[in-house]
């Protein structure tokens, strides 16, 4: 769905583990890494699109994750001119995204990048929380920064809790 301003409705998905690290995925056959994301189909809610994209891109089902939060509003980014398809109607000049923060509840083995038979990613890894903001392609950086800042209040306590648990476990009597 492309709105009257030329922005395609899209969902972004950030999956975190119990340590507050986030899943970072490499686009199939490329050297670029990003969070899973995808378009919202006509008649589909943002949450429905998120679950569909979650399965298509990383093979996870609703029972594998827990929704921790979502962005309060839709965030937009413009595509660089070289990526805008002028011959398509309506012309899409960028994405407007509703972001979801999910916690992985199942084992990592549930992640299957080839679940749909048409992989969008060919590798993934856990990275520190702020790492993606510095590493994503430049035209998505501002949206990533806003999303990560909004979600930090939810995710960073996971890191603090785990860090405290590790310290307690390392004490010697």
UniProtKB/Swiss-Prot annotation:
Q: Does the keyword Cell wall biogenesis/degradation apply?
A: no
SUPFAM superfamilies per the record? Nudix (SSF55811)
Tell me the Gene3D superfamilies matching this sequence.
Answer: Nucleoside Triphosphate Pyrophosphohydrolase
UniProt keyword Hydrolase, yes or no: yes
Per the record, what is one GO cellular component?
Answer: cytoplasm
Q: What biological process terms from GO does the record include? A: mRNA catabolic process
Q: Which Pfam families match?
A: NUDIX (PF00293)
Report motif location: Nudix box.
Answer: 38-59
- What function is annotated for this protein? Accelerates the degradation of transcripts by removing pyrophosphate from the 5'-end of triphosphorylated RNA, leading to a more labile monophosphorylated state that can stimulate subsequent ribonuclease cleavage.
PANTHER family the UniProt entry points to: M7GPPPN-MRNA HYDROLASE
Q: NCBIfam families this protein is in?
A: PRK00714.1-1 (NF001934), PRK00714.1-4 (NF001937), PRK00714.1-5 (NF001938)
Family classification: Belongs to the Nudix hydrolase family. RppH subfamily.
What name does the UniProt record give this protein? Answer: RNA pyrophosphohydrolase
Q: Which organism is it from?
A: Shewanella pealeana (strain ATCC 700345 / ANG-SQ1)
What lineage is this protein's organism placed in? Bacteria, Pseudomonadati, Pseudomonadota, Gammaproteobacteria, Alteromonadales
Gene name on record? rppH
């Amino acid at each position: 769905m492309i709105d009257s301003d030329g922005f395609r409705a899209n969902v972004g998905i950030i999956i975190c583990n119990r340590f507050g690290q986030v899943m970072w995925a490499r686009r199939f056959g490329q050297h670029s890494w990003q969070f899973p994301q995808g378009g919202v189909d006509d008649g589909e809610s943002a949450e429905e699109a998120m679950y569909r994209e979650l399965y298509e891109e990383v093979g996870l089902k609703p029972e594998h994750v827990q929704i921790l939060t979502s962005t309060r509003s839709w965030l937009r980014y413009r595509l660089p001119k070289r990526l805008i398809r002028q011959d398509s109607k309506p012309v899409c000049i960028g994405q407007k995204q509703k972001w979801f923060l999910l916690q992985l509840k199942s084992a990592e083995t549930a992640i299957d990048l080839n679940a749909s038979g048409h992989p969008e990613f060919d590798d993934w890894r856990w990275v520190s929380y702020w790492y993606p903001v510095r590493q994503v392609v430049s035209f998505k950086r501002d949206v990533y920064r806003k999303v990560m800042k909004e979600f930090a209040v939810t995710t960073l306590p996971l890191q603090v809790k785990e860090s405290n648990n590790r310290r307690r476990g390392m004490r010697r009597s």
